[in-house]
Amino acid sequence: MELWSELQSYQNLRRLLELASARTSSCWRILFGSTLTNVIYRAKEEYSSRFADLLSHNPGIFASLNLGHHSFFQEIVIRNLDFSSPGRTVSGLAFICFILDQWSAQTHLSQGYTLDYMAMALWRTLLRRKRVLGCLPAQRPHGLDPVQEEEEEEENLRAGLDPSTEL
C-alpha cells in the first residue's frame, strides 16, 4: 500500500474520507474500503477524545464553516496539519474525518457539500505541500507556449494598448 499514491487523486481522497467517516456502515467499510480506510477509521475512533479536546479550544470553527467563512478553518486546521510521515498523515486524515463527522451532525448543509469541501481543502493542501517539497513539478497555466506568445507580441506591437484614434 503506497500511501501517497492513494492521496494524489481528488476522487480517491474523497472516497477515502467518505468510507472512513461515520456516515458509512462498518459492513460497507469492510467490503469496499481499503486497508488505509480501516486504519484511518480506527485512528479516528481511538483519538476521538483528543480530537474533541483540540476542537474545544476553537469553538467558532463549525459556526464559521456553516456561514461559509472558510478562511478561519484554513488558518486554524488545514495549515497546522503535518504530512511529513505516514503516521502523521494518517492522524491528519483521521482528524479531518472527525471534523467531517462533527460538522455533518450539526449543520444544515448537505452531506455531499461537507464531504466535497473537506476533500478539496485537504487535496489542495497535499498538492501544495508536495510541490513545495519538490515531489511534484509545478505546471504552467493553460495557454500559449512561450514561443507563440513572443511571436504574437512581435506581430502586433500595439497588443494590449488603447485603440488608436483615427479621424
Swiss-Prot record:
Family label: Belongs to the adenoviridae E1B 19 kDa protein family.
InterPro entries with a match to the protein in the record: Adenovir_t-Ag_E1B_19kDa (IPR002924), Bcl2-like (IPR002475)
Xref: PROSITE patterns: BCL2_FAMILY
Annotated organism of origin: Human adenovirus F serotype 40
Name used for this protein in its record: E1B protein, small T-antigen
Subcellular location(s) per record: Host cell membrane; Host nucleus envelope; Host nucleus lamina
Keyword set includes Calcium: no
Its biological purpose: Putative adenovirus Bcl-2 homolog that inhibits apoptosis induced by TNF or FAS pathways, as well as p53-mediated apoptosis. Without E1B 19K function, virus production is compromised because of premature death of host cell. Interacts with Bax protein in cell lysates.
GO BP: any one term: symbiont-mediated suppression of host apoptosis
Pfam families reported for this sequence: Adeno_E1B_19K
Region of interest called Disordered, as start-end residue ranges on this chain: 143-167
Keywords carried by this UniProt record: Apoptosis, Early protein, Host cell membrane, Host membrane, Host nucleus, Host-virus interaction, Inhibition of host apoptosis by viral BCL2-like protein, Membrane, Modulation of host cell apoptosis by virus
Bilayer-crossing regions: none
Higher taxonomy: Viruses, Varidnaviria, Bamfordvirae, Preplasmiviricota, Tectiliviricetes
Major localization class: host cell
One cellular component term from this protein's GO annotations in UniProt: membrane
